[in-house]
């Protein structure tokens, strides 16, 4: 009887460990390192019909690892291009 009880406890602990490992990976437990998009010179951050300015574009480019951004109007669309990788 004692042997069966300890075998059940080992099985329960094994299942618990497997469950924690699987749920930890699916919930992003491995997100310790941030995923960064490689810095590509001239990357288009957004392309939209709203008006834009180079200041607004630059404010959006800085958190993505760039030093500046420029706003160009092409075919009545505002295109924000990031430049000067950090």
UniProtKB/Swiss-Prot annotation:
Highest rank taxon of the organism: Eukaryota
Residues spanning the signal sequence: 1-28
UniProtKB keywords: Antimicrobial, Disulfide bond, Fungicide, Plant defense, Secreted, Signal
Location(s), subcellular: Secreted
Disulfide linkage: 39-85, 52-71, 57-80, 61-82
A Gene Ontology biological process term: defense response to fungus
The protein's name in its UniProt record: Putative defensin-like protein 189
Species per Swiss-Prot/TrEMBL record: Arabidopsis thaliana
């Amino acid at each position: 009887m004692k042997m069966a009880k300890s075998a059940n406890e080992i099985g329960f602990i094994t299942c618990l460990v497997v469950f924690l490992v699987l749920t930890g990976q699916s919930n992003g437990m491995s997100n310790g390192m941030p995923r960064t998009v490689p810095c590509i010179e001239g990357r288009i951050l957004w392309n939209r019909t709203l008006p834009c300015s180079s200041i607004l574009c630059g404010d959006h480019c800085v958190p993505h690892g760039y030093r500046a951004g420029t706003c160009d109007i092409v075919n009545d669309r505002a295109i924000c291009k990031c430049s000067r990788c950090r």
